[in-house]
Swiss-Prot record:
One GO biological process term: FtsZ-dependent cytokinesis
Disulfide-bonded cysteines: none
Protein name, entry field: Cell division protein FtsB
Periplasmic domain ranges by topology: 22-111
Membrane topology summary: Single-pass type II membrane protein
Region (Disordered): 88-111
Highest classification ranks of the organism: Bacteria, Pseudomonadati, Pseudomonadota, Betaproteobacteria, Burkholderiales
Subunit structure: Part of a complex composed of FtsB, FtsL and FtsQ.
Keyword list, A-Z: Cell cycle, Cell division, Cell inner membrane, Cell membrane, Coiled coil, Membrane, Transmembrane, Transmembrane helix
Cytoplasmic side: 1-3
GO cellular component terms, semicolon-separated: cell division site; cell septum; plasma membrane
Gene: ftsB
Residue stretches spanning the membrane: 4-21
Bias (Low complexity): 101-111
Pro residues composition-biased segments: 90-100
């Protein structure tokens, strides 16, 4: 009787091994579910990024405002008649223009 119990216990263990640790076992399924959830999060972020880029492309293709905004922010362009004002924090040294630079006169400073 004791031998039969041991044999049945070993058989039960052999049957349970593929269920828990085998190729399609619970641990593998759990790990794959975790990977799928992480990929869903990544995909959601990429979908939001794609939607924003698509809206920007659509705006650039149809609207002048987006092109103007990009030219101002990325290229530093201004409209005619606008005045550029740059605020320099106190204590920052003011760069001196190079000799012969445009806008600098060769005459002595005025008094």
């Amino acid at each position: 009787m004791r031998l039969l119990f041991l044999v049945l216990l070993v058989l039960l263990g052999l049957i349970q091994y593929p269920l828990w640790l085998g190729k399609g076992g619970w641990f593998k399924v759990w790990d794959l579910q975790r990977q799928v959830a992480a990929q869903h999060e990544t995909n959601d972020g990429l979908r939001a990024r794609n939607a924003a880029l698509e809206a920007e492309v659509r705006d650039l293709a149809t609207g002048v405002g987006a092109i103007e905004e990009r030219a101002r922010s990325e290229l530093g362009m201004m409209r005619e008649g606008e005045v550029f004002v740059q605020i320099v924090p106190p204590g920052t040294p003011v760069p001196q223009p190079a000799p012969g630079a445009p806008g600098q006169t060769a005459s002595a400073p005025r008094r």
